[in-house]
UniProtKB/Swiss-Prot annotation:
GO biological process, one term: glycogen biosynthetic process
Residues carrying Phosphotyrosine: Y170
Name of protein: 1,4-alpha-glucan-branching enzyme
Gene Ontology, cellular component aspect: cytoplasm
The protein's role, per its UniProt record: Glycogen-branching enzyme participates in the glycogen biosynthetic process along with glycogenin and glycogen synthase. Generates alpha-1,6-glucosidic branches from alpha-1,4-linked glucose chains, to increase solubility of the glycogen polymer.
UniProt note: domains: Binds its carbohydrate substrate close to the active site, but also via regions close to the N-terminus; this may result in increased affinity and therefore increased catalytic efficiency.
Gene behind this protein: GBE1
Organism of derivation: Equus caballus
Pathway this chain belongs to: Glycan biosynthesis; glycogen biosynthesis
Binding site for (1,4-alpha-D-glucosyl)n: W104, K140
Amino acid sequence: MAAPAARADGSDAALAAALADVPDLGRLLEVDPYLKPYAPDFQRRYNRFSQTLDNIGKNEGGIDKFSRGYESFGVHRCADGGLYCKEWAPGAEGVFLTGDFNDWNPFSYPYKKLDYGKWDLYIPPKPNKSLLVPHGSKLKVVIRSKSGEILYRISPWAKYVVRESGNVNYDWIHWDPEQPYKFKHSRPKKPRSLRIYESHVGISSHEGKIASYKHFTCNVLPRIKGLGYNCIQMMAIMEHAYYASFGYQITSFFAASSRYGTPEELKELVDTAHSMGITVLLDVVHSHASKNSEDGLNMFDGTDSCYFHSGPRGTHDLWDSRLFIYSSWEVLRFLLSNIRWWLEEYGFDGFRFDGVTSMLYHHHGIGASFSGDYHEYFGLQVDEDALTYLMLANHLVHTLYPDSITIAEDVSGMPALCSPISQGGGGFDYRLAMAIPDKWIQLVKEFKDEDWNMGNIVYTLTNRRHLEKCIAYAESHDQALVGDKSLAFWLMDAEMYTNMSVLTPFTPVIDRGIQLHKMIRLITHALGGEGYLNFMGNEFGHPEWLDFPRKGNNESYHYARRQFHLTDDDLLRYKFLNNFDRDMNKLEERCGWLSAPQAFVSEKHEGNKVIAFERAALLFIFNFHPSKSYTNYRVGTTLPGKFKIVLDSDAAEYGGHQRLDHNTDFFSEPYEHNERPSSLLVYIPSRVALILQNVDPPN
């Protein structure tokens, strides 16, 4: 990142004041002295967070109580069989409950107006003590607006909504089963190394339909476990009316999407994953919300300012969605309670926060090209209300469950976003290394293999802030969306339809694609971060792209599925890529390179197209040259002794050409090479990745 020029307010007095206010700010500035001119910014951010937390304590009894909004808001069965209902609708003139239970009479059950825009209602049980509103009943909140308009709404706190065939809008279903799912398994401990399988339940079947929670539990979870992933990131779980939005236009924030099944079936999915030792993260969308009003948050009380900024500030120009007003007390309650709901009710172990860049800046990242100059991350362009909310959310998550994980999707690279709150940071555990997939797509689209720049690859993979952990990935769901395509399809394209059979010889295109696909994944895994992510299906080189059913494709599910049968077919070459992914993950589990300090890169040779580095006492060697193999190639190492091959992309089980003898012993000698005290001689075939392990170090 570019070093910033000193600011006028970076005086010694301002620095001293900031250090006095922010407990561990000195540690952050020790790691990155270039942040010293911005110490007052960290001071202000930390003080805003602390003051908000104090205000919550004084007015609400603490964040623990404040984040339990779902226990009172919405509709709840009381111990006596009655019903307690509560809503926040500051712009309403009247609020009512209607539904099956009263034959949809809109006004027979009025709420009582409370302070601060809140309304509540108690409905006693029937004389025989039976439930007036049984499980499965349809409900609506009726709002009388200030203009006199009568509006039918779904409660923002609704736990379950469904859309019946033929209906445009969702129906709110009172979810109160007699026998709710009981969790059987404890949460796994926080993984030392995070290997994430990014998943979407709906597309997890090879059939042209929306798959179910049950299908995912029975068919996909065992695959994930077998591949060596220890974490699932679940997309599109929060209810969204438009399936093709990929889950990013949320309409009901407390409802698990009913298109895949029931809330209890999602709980079973999470519990089953826990039984396998798999951590489960939710892709949480608190950066914006759907514009839908009849089955969404928008215009809930008849005004455009209930949960969102009013006027133009409340609309995202690119996403055509509503933007939360994070300074609002009740919006904070709603969002923090939403975070807690998913942790407590469904057993999720943390979150990947979507759209963090949009939250952090008033410009939402629109038209902003972040150069790395520190001025871009401070000052008036930063939405400090949103940043305060994110700090509160991270504080809540890590206070409730210290082993929980939070990941920020931020393309801007904001410094200290993944530093502890006590340092003035955002409190996230990880950020996504979003430049890495862009680099791979750029290389395969725009450059010949012989023109790939080794130094640029290494720079992209290692360009991350010290002590702020990154999740590296070669491709996620973003890279496969319609208009783009999977990495395997960029490499092999239409030949994947005709030349993936093991009964036919390798074509040059398929050979190149399979070898590079393995190398790209391994170097990303080993060099790119402190965690690794793979989108479902890409472990075996899923062909084509993702396109959800919509009018533009005649509502087709053809590209909204994952063709797992391809890797299960022993006569197809997809199995080779799948085998490599499995063994790469299982070797990382044994050796722990993701949790080791950043690698020392000893070689990035442009002419030879060779990259070599050490991490976790392993020696990684990559030869990206399309045709040149090297005999007795000298590679530097810190470790003396005997080395063996522990992973070889050229092995037969990975679709390689078997040019290496795995019985070979490699001995390093005290011959300095590339700033390493020892070195060894290795045969490196073309387009091959090797990992050597020191198996017999001298005393």
